[in-house]
């Protein structure tokens, strides 16, 4: 997938159509003046959307804009409070996801929920297994041969080289995402909702997905596509609708948009740069990784990071970047090699050792590994530094509150107070809370694994601004990212890995998309 934004001519005079797209023919879906309220929150306020058959309609907006709520209404998970939905010319009144599926509406959720101990085939046909009967027996039996055969046909269609009998737990997250797409295709849906479908898959798999989307379009299937990735939007969209604060902002064919205009409509303000990287003084070597190896995972990895420097760790999925970071943070053990901090060799047997030496890591999966979602903002911020607030066996709530308020102000976290439950915040604010948790400590090295995955463009800009500020304060930063624009926009140097080895190191001037991809694919 190209990381270069496709720039198209902006609309002449005006900011895009102020009503849903009304040109052309063949609307498969019309959502009119949809409202939805939750206790204390108006999630959707008169939102409208029109989608043409045989097109990809990209729905964009910052986290919290209401995109997921709108799609959950369409897919039968939520009931509407007001408005109406027309699907293939008929008014929809379904009150369940099963009814939506029966109508031909299928949704691929960003957060997967496969049955891990079942096979690929069993997951795809769960609840609608093909059956056969036997003479004299009232019960029907699952036809596993047919189910496996049909699954193999679907896998071949998408180019996936897996057996239908492979257990889901043996697949990568990326492959599980593709299996969800296979499941939607198997239902012969006439409208498929894809919520961040490429958030955890490689460029090769993205290209595979886009080819399948092209086939679906040709068959007349409508696709509502939610993504924060600008390059994807302009690569795949036929039409674009922009949401903000639960309301319709604008809609137009993708050919009438350019990135700057789209971003401005999404956030309601002008963002000067998504990558506000500034030159800051580079200091002495903080981290030195020497001949680091882990059997079967990565081999002979070496690089350095200096104070005030952001080093981008780039490579394809499976290159070993996260695995190296896990060793530096003490989550996994190396079989050979040395990790030095300020020249001193470290013995890293657990994250506790890393934290004690001033090393922090923000995981790529903030919800599973970075936050306690059911706890408050204040509790999450103080989580890694409870000793600072402890007096004997008691925690000083006053000190904890003061420190949390300081972090909220410094990182500009949008929350009404420290008592707010973290699960109810946007992805961008959740990521800031993970950062705040570590910044309370005495940090020397910060490892950021996919720091802006799944967050909107406005929040991305904020995270990037904070990274620059941390570097200015002398922090050494490792940034792992699968988004080339982010690597190119934020890195002082780029270390590229392929199949568990470092294949090259590039200065900011040398770092281009072509050079990185050449090294990431094993070239020299």
Swiss-Prot record:
This protein's GO cellular component annotations are:
plasma membrane
Report keywords, A-Z. ATP-binding, Cell inner membrane, Cell membrane, Membrane, Nucleotide-binding, Repeat, Sugar transport, Translocase, Transport
Specify whether Cell membrane is a keyword of the entry. Answer: yes
The ABC transporter domain sits at: 29-270, 280-524
GO molecular function, one example? ATP hydrolysis activity
Q: Which InterPro entries match?
A: AAA+_ATPase, ABC_carbohydrate_import_ATPase, ABC_transporter-like_ATP-bd, ABC_transporter-like_CS, P-loop_NTPase
Its EC top class is: translocase
Q: Where in the cell is it found?
A: Cell inner membrane
Q: Which SMART domains match?
A: AAA
Positions that bind ATP: 61-68
At the top level, the lineage of the source is Bacteria
Enzyme Commission code: 7.5.2.11, 7.5.2.7
Main localisation: membrane
Q: State the reactions this protein catalyses.
A: D-ribose(out) + ATP + H2O = D-ribose(in) + ADP + phosphate + H(+); D-galactose(out) + ATP + H2O = D-galactose(in) + ADP + phosphate + H(+)
Described purpose of this protein according to its UniProt entry: Part of an ABC transporter complex involved in carbohydrate import. Could be involved in ribose, galactose and/or methyl galactoside import. Responsible for energy coupling to the transport system.
Q: State what protein this is by name.
A: Putative ribose/galactose/methyl galactoside import ATP-binding protein 1
Organism from which the protein derives: Rhizobium etli (strain ATCC 51251 / DSM 11541 / JCM 21823 / NBRC 15573 / CFN 42)
């Amino acid at each position: 997938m190209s990381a270069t934004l496709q720039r198209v001519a902006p609309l002449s005079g005006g900011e895009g159509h102020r009503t849903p797209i009304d040109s052309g023919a063949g609307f498969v879906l019309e959502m009119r003046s949809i409202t939805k309220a939750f206790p204390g929150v108006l999630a959707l306020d008169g939102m409208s959307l029109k989608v043409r058959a045989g097109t990809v309609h990209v729905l964009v907006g910052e986290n919290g804009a209401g995109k997921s709520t709108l799609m959950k209404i369409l897919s039968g998970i939520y009931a509407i409070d007001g408005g109406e939905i027309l699907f293939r010319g008929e008014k929809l009144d379904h009150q369940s996801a099963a009814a939506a599926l029966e109508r031909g509406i299928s949704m691929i959720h960003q957060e997967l929920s496969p049955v891990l101990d079942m096979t690929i085939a069993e997951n795809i046909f769960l609840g609608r297994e093909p059956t056969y009967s036997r003479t004299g027996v009232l019960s029907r039996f699952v036809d596993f041969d047919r189910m496996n055969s049909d699954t193999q046909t679907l896998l071949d269609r998408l180019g996936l080289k897996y057996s239908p009998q492979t257990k889901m737990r043996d697949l990568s997250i990326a492959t599980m995402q593709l299996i969800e797409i296979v499941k939607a295709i198997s239902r012969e849906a006439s409208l498929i909702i894809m919520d961040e479908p490429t958030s955890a898959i490689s460029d090769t798999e993205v290209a595979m997905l886009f080819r399948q989307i092209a086939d679906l379009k040709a068959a007349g299937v409508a696709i509502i596509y939610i993504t924060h990735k600008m390059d994807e939007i302009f690569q795949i969209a036929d039409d674009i609708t922009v949401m903000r604060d639960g309301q319709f902002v604008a809609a137009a064919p993708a050919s009438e948009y350019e990135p700057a205009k789209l971003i401005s409509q999404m956030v309601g303000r002008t963002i000067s740069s998504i990558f506000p990287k500034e030159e800051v003084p580079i200091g002495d070597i903080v981290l030195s990784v020497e001949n680091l190896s882990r059997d079967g995972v990565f081999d002979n990895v070496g690089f350095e990071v200096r104070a005030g420097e952001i080093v981008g760790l780039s490579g394809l999925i499976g290159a070993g970047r996260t695995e190296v970071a896990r060793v530096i943070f003490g989550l996994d053990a190396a079989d050979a090699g040395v990790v030095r901090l300020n020249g001193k060799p470290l013995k890293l047997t657990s994250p506790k050792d890393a934290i004690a030496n001033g090393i922090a890591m923000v995981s790529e999966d903030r919800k599973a590994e970075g936050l306690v979602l059911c706890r408050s903002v204040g509790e999450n911020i103080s989580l890694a530094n409870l000793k600072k607030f402890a007096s004997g066996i008691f925690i000083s709530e006053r000190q904890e509150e003061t420190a949390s308020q300081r972090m909220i102000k410094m990182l500009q976290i949008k929350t009404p107070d420290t008592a707010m439950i973290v699960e109810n915040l946007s992805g961008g604010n959740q990521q800031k809370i993970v950062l705040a948790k570590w910044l309370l400590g005495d940090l020397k090295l910060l490892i950021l694994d996919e720091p802006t995955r799944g967050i909107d463009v406005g929040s991305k800009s904020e995270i990037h601004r904070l990274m620059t500020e941390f570097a200015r304060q002398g922090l050494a930063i490792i940034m792992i990212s699968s988004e080339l624009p982010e690597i190119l926009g934020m890195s002082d140097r780029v270390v590229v890995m392929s199949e568990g080895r470092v294949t090259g190191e590039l200065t900011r001037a040398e770092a281009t998309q072509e050079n990185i991809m050449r090294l990431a694919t094993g070239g020299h």
